[in-house]
UniProtKB/Swiss-Prot annotation:
It is found in: Secreted; Host Golgi apparatus. One of its GO terms (cellular component) is extracellular region. Induction: Expression is up-regulated in spores. This is Secreted RxLR effector protein RXLR-C08. Secreted effector that suppresses pattern-triggered immunity (PTI) in plant host. Its main location: secreted. Glycans are attached at residues 27, 35, 45, 108, 197, 374. It comes from Plasmopara halstedii. It comes from the Eukaryota. Has the canonical dEER motif, but lacks translocation RxLR motif, which characterizes most oomycete effectors identified so far.
Length: 503
């Protein structure tokens, strides 16, 4: 302490001299600086040499040189002081450690004496924790019947599953000793879980997978799960099943997209993504919802280059294989993007796959353009309908139907693309893409671009054409008319043609 006091006084004197020298006409030489002495508690005299009246430049040069030398000396002294303090601290720590070992102090006591009871989640990297680990090892050697568990002490302070996350994070630390401790403790914890038959359900809840946090599938919780499941033989539900039951489809899809960006989790994320797609196919999730789940409806830039677009195209093909309902990428883009955004989608394609898809989109129209198209074709539909049907409301239904039979059609005909098509009593789904179609007593029919009349067709929908609903107990609010220009018959339906067009 006496030495530190002398050193502090010495430093203060040097700095004071430097400032005095810089603000006066004194000329300090190298010899003068070297003559600084420290006899006991007294600071040696600082001899100054005064020559004749110096010039301004000489005065500034001499002052700056003296200040630089004093600064250099001060820096060296501070460095020495820091190094000396570190050595003293290490010596005292070793002395304290030896004293505790000699007295066989209980590690639970030394844990608090080292202030580890106040430590945060980074406790595993602290020097005091490393010291305590050595104390525990020494204590356990001398007291085989009174073993102290490092893992139990950590779990007591932080919680069992919180410690599992801490250990996994510490395994990737910069300090080798910390990594070794974390690896050993993790092995002990996994063994305990296995011996206690910890269920995957309990582990899933404890690791809080269901929080839907963005980093969920790229963080340490997933790695802990994988380590435990690789150490047990279990026929329990897979990770995907837990994720699917606790996380909304759109959120889960986003998590998987993020997880695929990490080399550590890309393989698992791809596997779960495939499982999710199979689940969607089982329950026949509509392609437009999958399009949104993949976040393909929000940003037109590089849309065709994204791996999620390829996933959607693959899903659409599988969906068609199960339902025979074709929904194209062109239709999805038209539904979710305006004309100027579609231009961005086409121009921003850079990959070979994206450019290949872009070639199929030059004729894309936005939904706004399709609405205009529907408004144009709808009057033609009604003129056509009432002209060919009869001169008045008493015309027979047979005459009306016969006028539509311009081309050979049957229930096996999936699409009507031109002419007038008649479908009657059909159980299979049918599409009208460009013709004038009449659906009567059919189970399911869709009018995507033509002009259609639905008569007693229970599951009719009009996403793009000009449509009239006859004897169909629905309203526009039921989703039957979700993009086309539509009218509903009679007083049973409050929605009118004018109302639907205004909407």
């Amino acid at each position: 302490m006496r030495l530190c006091g002398v050193a502090s006084a010495f430093l203060s004197t040097l700095i004071l001299i430097a400032h005095i020298d810089a603000s006066t006409n004194l000329n300090v030489s190298v010899t003068d600086v070297q003559n600084i002495s420290l006899p006991g508690d007294q600071i040696g005299n600082f001899t100054q040499s005064v020559s004749g009246p110096p010039s301004g430049d000489e005065e500034r040069t001499s002052a700056n040189s003296a200040i630089r030398k004093v600064d250099l000396f001060v820096e060296k002294l501070i460095t020495f002081q820091v190094a000396l303090r570190a050595k003293i601290n290490r010596f005292l720590a070793k002395l304290k450690l030896a004293w505790w070992r000699l007295r066989n102090v209980d590690p639970n006591v030394t844990f608090n004496k080292l202030n580890l009871h106040e430590a945060d989640n980074d406790i595993l990297s602290l020097d005091n924790f490393h010291t305590w680990v050595k104390l525990v090892e020494s204590y356990n050697l001398q007291h085989p019947a009174e073993q102290v568990s490092i893992l139990s002490k950590l779990q007591e302070q932080f919680g069992e599953f919180e410690v599992s996350i801490m250990l996994e994070q510490a395994k990737n630390g910069a300090d080798k000793y910390t990594e070794d401790i974390a690896l050993e403790l993790q092995h002990e914890q996994i063994s305990r879980w296995r011996d206690d038959n910890l269920s995957l359900t309990a582990l899933y809840k404890a690791l809080q997978f269901g929080k839907s946090e963005p980093s969920l599938l790229t963080g340490p919780a997933l790695r802990v799960w994988n380590i435990y499941t690789s150490n047990i033989e279990s026929a329990e539900t897979s990770l995907f099943d837990y994720l699917y039951q606790t996380i909304e489809d759109a959120h889960l899809s986003s998590l998987l997209i993020a997880a695929k960006q990490s080399p550590e989790t890309v393989e698992l994320a791809t596997k779960i993504q495939n499982q999710l797609r199979q689940k969607w196919l089982e329950i026949l999730v509509p392609p437009n919802l999958v399009f949104q789940h993949y976040k393909l409806d929000t940003n037109p830039t590089h849309l065709l280059d994204r791996p999620e677009t390829k996933l959607w195209v693959r899903y659409q093909k599988m969906y068609w294989g199960k339902t025979k309902k074709e929904v194209t990428l062109k239709e999805m883009i038209e539904d979710f993007y305006k004309a100027d955004e579609i231009a961005i989608i086409i121009k921003s394609a850079t990959t070979d796959y994206g450019k290949h898809l872009a070639k199929k989109l030059p004729q894309c129209d936005s939904k706004h353009f399709k609405t205009f198209h529907n408004l144009t074709i709808l009057p033609l539909l009604f003129v056509f309908h009432y002209t060919i049907g009869a001169e008045d409301d008493l015309s027979s239904e047979k005459n009306l139907i016969s006028q539509y039979n311009h081309v050979p059609t049957s229930c096996e005909t999936a699409n009507c693309v031109a002419g007038g098509c008649l479908f009657e009593n059909c159980a299979s789904p049918l599409l009208c893409r460009g013709g004038l179609c009449y659906f009567r007593k059919c189970k399911d029919a869709t009018c995507e671009g033509g002009a259609c009349i639905f008569d007693n067709t229970a599951e009719a929908s009009c996403p793009g054409g000009g449509c009239q609903f006859v004897n169909v107990p629905v309203t526009l609010a039921d989703g039957y008319c979700d993009g086309g220009g539509c009218t509903l018959d009679g007083d049973d339906h409050p929605s009118s043609l004018a109302g639907s067009l205004a909407e």
